[in-house]
Amino acid sequence: MSKIVYKFGGTSLATAENICLVCDIICKDKPSFVVVSAIAGVTDLLVDFCSSSLREREEVLRKIEGKHEEIVKNLAIPFPVSTWTSRLLPYLQHLEISDLDFARILSLGEDISASLVRAVCSTRGWDLGFLEARSVILTDDSYRRASPNLDLMKAHWHQLELNQPSYIIQGFIGSNGLGETVLLGRGGSDYSATLIAELARATEVRIYTDVNGIYTMDPKVISDAQRIPELSFEEMQNLASFGAKVLYPPMLFPCMRAGIPIFVTSTFDPEKGGTWVYAVDKSVSYEPRIKALSLSQYQSFCSVDYTVLGCGGLEEILGILESHGIDPELMIAQNNVVGFVMDDDIISQEAQEHLVDVLSLSSVTRLHHSVALITMIGDNLSSPKVVSTITEKLRGFQGPVFCFCQSSMALSFVVASELAEGIIEELHNDYVKQKAIVAT
């Protein structure tokens, strides 16, 4: 019998009404495995709890309890919210939060949501087995962004006795070699789902979210963006890596390894279809076309001329970035100049300015704030003609282009933030909607 993994995100569980929709789907389809995120907004509240003063933590705890109690009240089922949230009480006495404490605290969101969904399904006559994520997702010792130990997970999986037809599992969390709780990183519930799929040799992963699949561009930016019926793993990887928020980038690797297709659809309107993501033979030559666009605003661009450092300059700069804990969104090196993009939401401007001070000790460094990273995803985009065509189009916007970076499936460039949406709209109208060849 084929196995299917369903994953429901936080927006799918945000209200009692939404949870009822989720449980309708589960009880009707009876998927082999169900992975759930925390209820929308709960993880953010738990992060706030960790960063707050002792006095403020009491207020955050009340908000966390209140959010869950309102949902339980509207579901009209018995559910012990206070029993779950009592796990936070010891942290009202101790200000310092270690990385292990952080992982334990944030895991509460998924622990509650999995238990709640299971309880609702039970009232409808479908008893889900509980598969504890900490006993399945086995990782290294990083508490906040752990890496799965796949060999260990596979060995352990074969020892499990899975006798029930359907199981629910918490997303986002796992455990290390000492059995301590760890996190897979924000967005990690998608990763949990595909890891379970790989272990179970599933035939499909179905991601339920608040949109009907993957779009040619964020509909909040381009109102007439179109749903994409299908994408290759590589195309989706590029989209996810360069700003598309629908899927968490690492979650693709288990499905790529095992050849398991992913279907992205809406919890609220599943009959309208979605987007398939699967392996596609890219050895065939395709004409240069843009399939989708992504936009990352609130970025900064740094260029470093390391000519004076000689042949070891790039390695030295990379070492400085690593020592400052900076993982650029995009990096390109050419002619003794390296340029990289930093996300202002992740790396504060204060941290960026400090980095520039360090880099300037041995190189000529320039930092540009208020820029945007635009990426085009498609086929055969690495030809000089494509870059020439796009460069010519950008000249019409009379603003600087800070850098280009290209591969056969992705072409990225950095522009001033105020120009970005106009550029995106023109590229979408001229190439994506028309399915036009970029360069002839």
UniProtKB/Swiss-Prot annotation:
Q: Keywords on this record?
A: Amino-acid biosynthesis, ATP-binding, Diaminopimelate biosynthesis, Kinase, Lysine biosynthesis, Nucleotide-binding, Transferase
Task: From the UniProt record, report the name of the gene that encodes this protein.
Answer: lysC
Q: What Pfam families does the database record attribute to this sequence?
A: AA_kinase
**Gene3D superfamilies given in the database record:** 3.30.70.260, Acetylglutamate kinase-like (3.40.1160.10), Aspartokinase, catalytic domain (1.20.120.1320)
GO BP field: diaminopimelate biosynthetic process; homoserine biosynthetic process; lysine biosynthetic process via diaminopimelate; threonine biosynthetic process
Q: Which GO terms describe its molecular function?
A: aspartate kinase activity; ATP binding
InterPro entries in the cross-refs: AceGlu_kinase-like_sf (IPR036393), Asp/Glu/Uridylate_kinase (IPR001048), Asp_kin_monofn (IPR005260), Asp_kinase (IPR001341), AsparK_Bifunc_asparK/hSer_DH (IPR042199), Aspartate_kinase_CS (IPR018042)
Q: Please report which protein family the annotation says this sequence is part of.
A: Belongs to the aspartokinase family.
PROSITE patterns hit by this protein: ASPARTOKINASE (PS00324)
Source domain of life: Bacteria
Q: What class of enzyme is it?
A: transferase
What protein name is recorded for this chain?
Aspartokinase
Q: Which PANTHER family match?
A: ASPARTATE KINASE, ASPARTOKINASE
What Enzyme Commission number(s) appear in the record? 2.7.2.4
Q: In which pathway does it act?
A: Amino-acid biosynthesis; L-lysine biosynthesis via DAP pathway; (S)-tetrahydrodipicolinate from L-aspartate: step 1/4; Amino-acid biosynthesis; L-methionine biosynthesis via de novo pathway; L-homoserine from L-aspartate: step 1/3; Amino-acid biosynthesis; L-threonine biosynthesis; L-threonine from L-aspartate: step 1/5
GO CC terms, sorted:
cytosol
Reaction it catalyzes: L-aspartate + ATP = 4-phospho-L-aspartate + ADP
